[in-house]
């Protein structure tokens, strides 16, 4: 009976083709979502940096006058 148990365990550990495809698709979707989040964060940070730079320039300009 032990060899049958071993076969069952091997079957459970080895994902089927459909499972692998689902896993790969899920990983690709996760990667795309993370990439979109990174781009969105980068955009926000760039805008903030630009605002801070403009404020700094105004401050420097008012000090020199």
UniProtKB/Swiss-Prot annotation:
<dbReference type="GO" id="GO:0005856">
    <property type="term" value="C:cytoskeleton"/>
</dbReference>
<keyword id="KW-0963">Cytoplasm</keyword>
<dbReference type="GO" id="GO:0008017">
    <property type="term" value="F:microtubule binding"/>
</dbReference>
<dbReference type="Pfam" id="PF15674">
    <property type="entry name" value="CCDC23"/>
</dbReference>
<dbReference type="GO" id="GO:0005737">
    <property type="term" value="C:cytoplasm"/>
</dbReference>
<dbReference type="GO" id="GO:0031397">
    <property type="term" value="P:negative regulation of protein ubiquitination"/>
</dbReference>
<dbReference type="GO" id="GO:0061564">
    <property type="term" value="P:axon development"/>
</dbReference>
<keyword id="KW-0206">Cytoskeleton</keyword>
<keyword id="KW-0175">Coiled coil</keyword>
<feature type="compositionally biased region" description="Basic and acidic residues">
    <location>
        <begin position="1"/>
        <end position="22"/>
    </location>
</feature>
<dbReference type="GO" id="GO:0006508">
    <property type="term" value="P:proteolysis"/>
</dbReference>
<dbReference type="InterPro" id="IPR031378">
    <property type="entry name" value="SVBP"/>
</dbReference>
<comment type="function">
    <text>Enhances the tyrosine carboxypeptidase activity of vash1 and vash2, thereby promoting the removal of the C-terminal tyrosine residue of alpha-tubulin. Also required to enhance the solubility and secretion of vash1 and vash2. May play a role in axon and excitatory synapse formation.</text>
</comment>
<comment type="similarity">
    <text>Belongs to the SVBP family.</text>
</comment>
<dbReference type="GO" id="GO:0005576">
    <property type="term" value="C:extracellular region"/>
</dbReference>
<protein>
    <recommendedName>
        <fullName>Small vasohibin-binding protein</fullName>
    </recommendedName>
</protein>
<feature type="coiled-coil region">
    <location>
        <begin position="31"/>
        <end position="51"/>
    </location>
</feature>
<feature type="region of interest" description="Disordered">
    <location>
        <begin position="1"/>
        <end position="30"/>
    </location>
</feature>
<dbReference type="GO" id="GO:0009306">
    <property type="term" value="P:protein secretion"/>
</dbReference>
<dbReference type="GO" id="GO:1905048">
    <property type="term" value="P:regulation of metallopeptidase activity"/>
</dbReference>
<keyword id="KW-0964">Secreted</keyword>
<dbReference type="GO" id="GO:0045177">
    <property type="term" value="C:apical part of cell"/>
</dbReference>
């Amino acid at each position: 009976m032990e060899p049958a148990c071993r076969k069952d365990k091997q079957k459970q550990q080895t994902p089927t083709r459909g499972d692998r495809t689902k896993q790969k698709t899920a990983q690709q979707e996760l990667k795309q979502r993370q990439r979109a989040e990174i781009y969105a964060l980068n955009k926000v940070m760039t805008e903030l940096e630009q605002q801070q730079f403009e404020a700094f320039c105004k401050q420097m300009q008012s000090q020199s006058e």
